[in-house]
């Protein structure tokens, strides 16, 4: 458990132009302008965005491993680990299902594909062939087996080779190894204390490295957004603007109404939480990857009063099991294709669609283009909706990717606070102070003597 130290002097106010969120906003605007006016040159800047995401992925595995191991090893009762995990999974299952239902309901109300009268036979199926092929690998058994790495080192380096290169760390495999190691460290008691002390000492330089890497965020966001606008162009949104607009509006309502209500019931404001995470959200927007802000999210949730052990379990797990934005997209896009191709779906078909989407969305953890691939996997199992219809949304999927990532990110932030509250592992005074824009007291490492704040006693 983290202990509050007396607050030291507040840091000097940082000029707005040196704050990360302002720099990312400027980078996104400049990248969009460059992509619009110089598309050919803008497309060549894709490596800037790719390089930044690779830098972040480089540090994700150590952050998750250190946070989880030190958190679990510091718990006095190991049954707490199972209880936290069980509560998190119950939350994920309920809200993932709710997100799927919301997408389904909105598709029926808005009817984004009605009147298009598309003949599936006239569509270019080759455009989505690669996604359909990838979707065949997404099975429940395969997903569960993939959680277990071939070796301890393999979880951090990646066991699979794609196009002659290792895939990189697998979040679920790192989580699996970290939980086992943390439990083992707790079971050996005092003999494991030197190892625990070493790992706790490593946390400070690792998170300092995260801060250093985040300074490159504006460059990564600039390159990623310039490439997107340069390659696809804003014009590609026009024909399918109704679908894109429906998805953005649905995601916004899900965050403000459903997550907002959950937040209110747990004693905090989702709008204040969004403001607190504005720099990370802008980074997600620029890179179209919620993974790019994972280390910062874990650090900020801990700073906001959530216990490190809860943060370490909920956030990485949520990145695979709590994909609210992806779930909304899957049912909304599936019904859009059905409406556009005049495909009638019975209630039974739609229930089957929900069930398959729930499973396939979990099987796409860590897969590039996960939203589109899981949609292909879902449609492949529900044959009533033509898979060829995915060609209709291929051109605008990239623009919906940002919204998926933002909604997923906010959903995991809310989940972390909620599960912490359920587990009595939330310093509510600290959370209120942070969300109101205040500077919280410094946090002492696990095991350092001190007095727990009132809201944790």
Swiss-Prot record:
Q: Which residues cross the membrane?
A: 22-42, 55-75, 90-110, 138-158, 168-188, 209-229, 242-262
Under the heading InterPro entries, the entry gives: C4_dicarb_transport, Na-dicarboxylate_symporter, Na-dicarboxylate_symporter_CS, Na:dicarbo_symporter_sf
**What is any Pfam family matched here?**
SDF
Q: Where in the cell is it found?
A: Cell inner membrane
Q: What are the protein's UniProt keywords?
A: Cell inner membrane, Cell membrane, Membrane, Symport, Transmembrane, Transmembrane helix, Transport
Which Gene3D superfamilies does the UniProt record give? Sodium:dicarboxylate symporter
Q: Which PROSITE patterns match?
A: NA_DICARBOXYL_SYMP_1, NA_DICARBOXYL_SYMP_2
Q: Which Gene Ontology terms cover its molecular function?
A: fumarate transmembrane transporter activity; malate:proton symporter activity; succinate transmembrane transporter activity
GO CC aspect terms: plasma membrane
Task: Using the record for this protein, list the coiled-coil segments as residue ranges, or answer none.
Answer: none
- GO BP: any one term: L-aspartate transmembrane transport
Its membrane topology:
Multi-pass membrane protein
Q: What does this protein do?
A: Responsible for the transport of dicarboxylates such as succinate, fumarate, and malate from the periplasm across the membrane.
The record's family statement is: Belongs to the dicarboxylate/amino acid:cation symporter (DAACS) (TC 2.A.23) family.
Q: Which NCBIfam families match?
A: PRK01663.1, PRK13027.1
> What is the name of this protein?
C4-dicarboxylate transport protein
């Amino acid at each position: 458990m983290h202990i509050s130290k007396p607050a030291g002097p507040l840091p000097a106010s940082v000029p707005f132009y040196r704050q990360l969120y302002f720099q990312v906003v400027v980078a996104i605007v400049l990248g969009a302008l460059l992509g619009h006016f110089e598309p050919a040159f803008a497309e060549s800047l894709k490596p800037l965005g790719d390089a930044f995401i690779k830098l972040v992925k480089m540090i994700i595995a150590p952050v998750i491993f250190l946070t989880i191991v030190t958190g679990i090893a510091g718990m006095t009762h190991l049954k707490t680990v199972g209880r936290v995990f069980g509560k998190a999974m119950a939350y994920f299952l309920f809200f993932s299902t709710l997100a799927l239902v919301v997408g389904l309901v909105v598709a029926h109300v808005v009817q984004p594909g009605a009147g298009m009268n598309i003949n599936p036979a006239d569509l270019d199926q080759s455009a989505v062939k690669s996604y359909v092929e990838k979707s065949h690998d997404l099975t429940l058994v395969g997903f569960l087996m993939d959680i277990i790495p071939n070796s301890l080192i393999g979880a951090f380096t990646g066991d699979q080779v794609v196009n002659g290169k290792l895939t990189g760390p697998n979040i679920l495999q790192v989580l699996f190894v970290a939980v086992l190691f943390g439990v083992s460290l707790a079971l050996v008691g005092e003999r494991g204390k030197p190892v625990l002390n070493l790992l706790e000492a490593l946390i400070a330089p690792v998170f300092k490295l995260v801060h250093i890497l985040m300074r490159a965020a504006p460059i990564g966001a600039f390159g990623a957004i310039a490439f997107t606008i340069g390659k696809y162009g804003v014009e590609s949104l026009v024909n399918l603007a109704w679908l894109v607009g429906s998805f953005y509006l649905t995601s916004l309502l899900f965050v403000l109404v459903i997550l907002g209500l959950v937040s209110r019931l747990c004693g905090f404001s989702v709008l204040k939480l969004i403001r607190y995470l504005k720099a990370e959200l802008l980074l997600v927007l620029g890179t179209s990857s919620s993974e790019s802000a994972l280390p910062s999210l874990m650090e900020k949730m801990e700073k906001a009063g959530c216990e490190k052990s809860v943060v370490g379990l909920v956030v990485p797990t949520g990145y695979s099991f709590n994909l609210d934005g992806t779930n909304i997209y899957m049912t909304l896009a599936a019904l859009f294709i059905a409406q556009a191709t005049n495909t009638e779906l019975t209630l039974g078909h739609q229930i089957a669609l929900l069930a398959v989407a729930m499973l396939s969305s979990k099987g796409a953890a860590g897969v590039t283009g996960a939203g589109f691939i899981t949609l292909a996997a879902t449609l492949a199992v529900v044959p009533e909706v033509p898979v060829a219809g995915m060609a209709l949304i291929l051109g605008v999927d990239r623009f919906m990717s940002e919204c998926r990532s933002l909604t997923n990110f906010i959903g995991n932030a809310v989940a972390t606070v909620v599960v912490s509250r359920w587990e009595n592992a939330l310093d509510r005074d600290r959370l209120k102070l942070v969300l109101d824009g205040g500077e919280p007291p410094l946090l002492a490492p696990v095991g350092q003597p001190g007095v727990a704040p009132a809201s944790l006693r």
